[in-house]
Amino acid sequence: MTIPALRVTHCPVNTAGVPWQNVQALRRKGVDARLVVFERYKLHPEADESLDRRGGLARQQATQWRALARLLPRTDIFHFYFGLTLVPKSLQFPILRAARKKSVMHFLGSDIRGKPSAELAWAAKAGARIVGSYDAIRWVPEAEVVPPGINLSEYTPVPPSDRERPVVVHAPSSRRRKGTEHVIAACEQLPVSLEIVEGLHHDDARRRYERADIVVDQLNAGWYGLFAIEAMAVGKPVVSFLHDEAVARTEEAFGVRVPIVSATADTLVERLRPLVESAEERRRVGAESRAYIERVHDADRLADRLLDIYSRL
C-alpha cells in the first residue's frame, strides 16, 4: 500500500526512537515523511531536522512558530507525539483546521499513564489518537493501537547461550519505575550474572543486550517497552510484568501468543528459575519471541496501519 503524494511531518520529539522508525518505514512505502524535533535526544538523536531551540520561553516559541509557518505548505498531515505540538495546543489545532491540514496525536505511554480522562480530553481535537498497546488504551479508549515498530532487517537473532551461569541484562531508563532494586535482589538469589545497562547510546546498548541470555524489562508498568521489543527481535527470552487483560486483547488482535514471561517483584525469582536452569527453555522462548516480533512489531507492517489511519482522517 503506497500513497506517493502524501506528505507527513512527524514532530516534535523522537521519544524512544519510535517516531524515527515510523518515518523510515513510511518512506519505504513511498510517503514523503520527515521528522522534525525540538532538540536531538542523547540516546536517540535521529531526526531530519532539529529546531535546536535556544534562550527563554519567548525565544523558543518564536522558533516553533517559524517552523510551523515553514512546514504548513509542505505538509498534508501532522503526526504529533508524546502529547506535544509545535505551538500551544489551543492554537495548534484551530490553525491546522483553518489550513485544511490533518493531524494525529500519538501517545507513547508515560505521557498518559495514570492521567484522568479530563486531562486528556484535548486530544480529541486531533483527527485521530494512537496508543502503542492494548494496555495504554485504557487511558484513551477511543484511540487506535499501533505498537512500536522496528526494522527487522537490522536485527539478526543471537540465540541465548548454554553457559551454566546465564547473563541477565536489565536496562532501566528509571530504576524506580522499572523495579531495578527487585531485579538485583532476585538475581542475588540465582546463579546468574546481572548486567545493568544505563546511559548508553542506543547502538552501544544494543550490543550489550545481544550478549544476554535472559532480559528483564520492568516490574511495575504492566506492559513492555522498546528495550523488550529489541531484545525479543534478537531472540532473547524476556521477563516483564504484564496486565492479563492487555495480553488477552493483544493475542486476540494479532492472532499470536505473547511469549513474555510475566512476573512481579514477588514472583520474579520463581519465574526466572526455569530460564536460568535450562538453556533449551531459553532458546525456545527466544525463538518464539522473535516470531512474535515479526507478527506484531514489524515497522513495515505497522506503516500500513498508519496509512490506513491517515486515509480515514
Predicted feature residues:
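A charged, aromatic-enriched C-terminal amphipathic alpha-helix characteristic of glycosyltransferases
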Residues: E277-Y310
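Conserved donor-binding/catalytic core segment of Leloir-type glycosyltransferases
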Residues: V8, P157-K178, I184-E188
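Acidic donor-binding loop of glycosyltransferase active sites
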Residues: D76, E210-W223, K236
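Short N-terminal targeting/anchoring amphipathic segment
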Residues: R7-P12, A69-P88, V104, V215-Q218
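Donor nucleotide-sugar binding/catalytic pocket of nucleotide-sugar-dependent glycosyltransferases
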Residues: I112, A124-P157
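Active-site proximal beta-strand in glycosyltransferases
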Residues: I77-F82, F93-R113, A128-V131
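Short hydrophobic beta-strand element within catalytic cores of glycosyltransferases
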Residues: P237-A246
